[in-house]
């Protein structure tokens, strides 16, 4: 469909119930209220769980909830069929059992064990440029500076507040944990290579101050046109 009028005509047919079978993507769920259906089938329902983002289970669960809501109530004969190879995953189990508390408790437990929000604060760092080797080297240098600044003694000097160790969550010393560098899941975008670093901190301000100090150092030693350093505090997207 290339014209808005064509899309509008299609939605009107769906609203009037002119078709017995509707095949669509997640776009159907974004449109708003739809007439309920006797049978809803979801192909590869677990596909979103493989996205390299700590929120992937949460997003998948809510997307599937919206899809399930398209089915008539069970008492009226409504049915939902999910295709999945991860039937034991808590997002799938919570959906199958219609138990939101199951999903919440399992998700919070997993995030706490791995050191992800809401247990800790995250800062996502992105290094990009047109020269792949230069981007990799810059990301490696930034991670090394972050690691040096993340030592308990140094990090404690960057903030007037007393920092708490993150060790109870991840079994590592110090108030910060530096993950990476690693190629971004989207390794190249608009001609620019991309590497990422993830900073974890129990104290949000401590992480911000360490990153602020190191990014200034990196920008002084790298020309901005060749290498770009992006900082995303409490990121919504991880890639």
PLM regions: where:
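Accessory helical-bundle/CTD segments and flexible terminal tails appended to RecA-like ATPase motors
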Residues: 3, 9-17, 28-52, 66-154, ...
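Substrate-gripping "pore-loop 1 plus following alpha2 helix"
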Residues: 54-63
């Amino acid at each position: 469909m290339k014209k808005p009028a064509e899309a509008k005509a299609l939605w009107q047919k769906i609203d009037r119930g002119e078709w017995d079978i509707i095949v669509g993507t997640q776009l159907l769920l974004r449109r708003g209220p739809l007439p309920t259906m006797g049978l809803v089938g979801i192909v590869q329902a677990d596909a979103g769980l493989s996205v390299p983002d700590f929120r992937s289970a949460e997003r998948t669960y809510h997307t599937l909830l919206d899809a399930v809501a398209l089915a008539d109530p069970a008492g009226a004969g409504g049915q939902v069929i999910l295709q999945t190879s991860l039937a034991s995953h808590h997002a799938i189990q919570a959906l199958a059992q219609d138990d939101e508390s199951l999903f919440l408790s399992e998700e919070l437990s997993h995030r706490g064990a791995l050191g992800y929000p809401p247990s800790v604060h995250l800062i996502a760092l992105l290094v990009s440029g047109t020269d792949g080797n230069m981007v990799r080297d810059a990301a490696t240098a930034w991670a090394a500076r972050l690691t040096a600044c993340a030592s308990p003694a140094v990090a404690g000097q960057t903030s007037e507040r007393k920092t708490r160790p993150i060790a109870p969550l991840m079994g590592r010393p110090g108030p910060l944990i530096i993950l990476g560098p690693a190629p971004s899941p989207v390794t190249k975008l608009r001609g620019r290579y991309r590497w990422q670093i993830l900073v974890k901190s129990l104290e949000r301000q401590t992480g911000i101050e360490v990153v602020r100090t190191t990014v200034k150092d990196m920008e002084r030693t790298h020309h901005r046109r060749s290498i770009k350093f992006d900082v995303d505090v409490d990121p919504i997207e991880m890639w």
